[in-house]
Amino acid sequence: MHAERGLGSVLGLLLGALLQGGCDATLPVEPSAGPHQPWVLPESLRAQVKSTLDRYGDQPAAARGADQGSDPAALDPTHAYSRGELIDLAQRRNPATRAAWEQARQAALATGVPRATLLPRLAASVVGGYQRLSTPVTLPFGGTRTLTTDVQAVIPILTVEWLLFDFGERTSALEVTDHLATVARVQFNQAHQQVVFDVNRAFNAGGAAGRKEAAAGRALAAARQVLAAAETRAQRGVGTRIEIAQANTQLAQAQLSLVQAQGESATARVALNAALGTPHGTLIRLRDSAEGLPAATAEGLDQVIARALVQRPDIVAGVAQLQAAQAGERGVAAAFRPKVGLIASLSTGDNQFSFNGGTTFAVPLQQTGVLIGVTLPLYEGGLRDSRLQSARSRILSAQAAVATTRGAAAAEIAAAYEALRSALAAYHAADVLVAAAGVGSAAARTGFEVGVGTLTDAAAADKALLDAENARADARRNAFDAAATLAFVTAGLTAEPP
């Protein structure tokens, strides 16, 4: 008796635990303890994210195959890369191009679905079975007997279904998928151009930072030369401690300028790694670009805008979206019109009979049928009007989007067109400024060394030269950035320098 009670208690506890667990499992998941506290990420979710990033976070495009071999997109730390080489690496490694390519591929594959509906569907099936029928039979001379009939059959069936005519509903669906595939393809092109644009800007920033570093190094050497001259003058009794202090200040300012230029180089390196799709700490050597300044376009602004509008990915995608919406409206209208279809079937086989376990005999069976049907929707409860209004609304929305995109694109092109001209003019002015500042710096430093000038003049002249060289480096960068921007907004950006 005690054993039975103990067993009952254990079973009761187990049942209670199961019920409690079931109730807990059905409780809603709260976002956090309250509106005043943020939601805390569970450790399990952190582990899942880390595992996913380790697996997919830094995988170059060339590493997707089973036989990877050497990675053609690998970086060589001893090689100095040119602009074109970096763009080629970015197009291979940047995950944005891989994602856009897969999306374009998915859109292209989606066109196969409506294409398949234009063709007949062929299906094969097999039906088999066994049946026993027992029937009592009254004999003429009295008494009854049971007649047992066994029937078994295996019948293969071939069926063909073909929608012959639907007033263009399937064709409209095919047009929709074709236009959406066009959208995905031009978005893939836009992703490539965005990568090229990002690499161009990062390369220009790295080049400008390198020139600023070189200018800061020259300014630092000049400051040390001035400090040495001040100390020599003091030793000869013709200088003062004030001059030495001013020279030390100039030296510190030159060192600060060098540190700032090195910081700009580090920032440019991070941006370049982001554009390439490489880890942010990767060291990439840049080839000192000796390429000349980009030239301003000889075309007028109106010509540039007219040429660009027909090839910009966002406008091409907007027009394709509009065409898809128009095809969708035609498909909605056709969906409520009659449909004509054909159904044909062919089956053959043998029915095998036996009575009371006697001799089995077969009866051949063959059936052939062809049916043509017409379906006509009569009443949909307002569904047709609702779907048509929704389709027309999508057309109006797409038309407005095209107009908005066109206006924004024209404004972007005009701004980039003028920015390039201004940047080129600024560079030429900065180049003249550097030449003048260089002459003034050399003269002031020589005058101070021979005692006919002051240290203040020499320091100011050296500072003016450094500022002029930094301004020229920025102006050169701005000119290349403006050229890349104009090429980008006109959909003409390629791997070649703009």
Residue ranges and their predicted role:
Residues 69-79, 125-159, 287-298, 330, ...:
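Small/polar, glycine/serine/threonine/aspartate-rich low-complexity segments that form flexible
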Residues 86-91, 147, 239, 243, ...:
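Amphipathic alpha-helical coiled-coil scaffold segments and their short linker/junction regions
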Residues 88-98, 105-121, 150, 157-175, ...:
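A glycine-/polar-enriched beta->alpha junction
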Residues 104-106, 111-113, 174-176, 181, ...:
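Heptad-repeat amphipathic alpha-helical coiled-coil interaction surface used
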Residues 234-238, 448-452, 489:
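A short glycine-centered flexible hinge/capping loop motif at secondary-structure junctions
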